[in-house]
Design a protein with these regions (language model features):
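Short helix-capping segments at alpha-helix termini
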Residues: 38, 114-119
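Generic structural signal for residues in well-ordered beta-strands
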Residues: 45, 121-123
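Histidine-rich, glycine-flanked metal-binding segment
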Residues: 1-4, 9-56
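Metal-associated gating/positioning segment near the N- to mid-region
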Residues: 51-116
Length: 123
């Protein structure tokens, strides 16, 4: 599927400008300053007038508390909340029970994230 975010305020690479953003198969295909010259008929068009289009945010310190303290939060719900706020990647802290301080525990945590995270992750 191809999607065109049209007439938004794009913030990218230290610049701010009005433009369009073309997405193809969930990936950015093209960033256009101004308007796309010709709009193919197979596009889903989203009017982004008055909206900001920004790169995905990286949150380098989250506390999702999994494993061991999931009553406080977990990777599944925390990553979905992050995605809703524009976060595309997170770095989770090891303050869980047991603490993620061995390679084995790290592999277990990576598996949990692989099965549950809505965004990119690291530990």
């Amino acid at each position: 599927m191809r999607i065109l975010l049209q007439s938004g305020t794009i913030i990218n690479e230290g610049r701010i400008f009005k433009g369009d953003l073309l997405i193809h198969n969930d990936r950015i295909e093209k960033i256009i300053e101004g308007k796309l010259d010709s709009v193919p008929g197979d596009l889903k068009i989203i009017d982004a007038t008055g909206k900001y289009i920004i790169p995905g945010v990286i949150d380098d310190q989250v506390h999702f508390r999994e494993p061991g303290l999931t009553h406080k939060g977990d990777i599944r719900e925390g990553s979905r909340a992050a995605a809703a706020g524009g976060v595309t990647s997170f770095m989770d802290m090891p303050n869980v029970k047991p603490p993620t301080i061995t390679n084995e525990l790290l592999r277990e945590k990576q598996q949990i994230a692989k099965e549950n995270s809505a965004v990119n992750y690291s530990f």
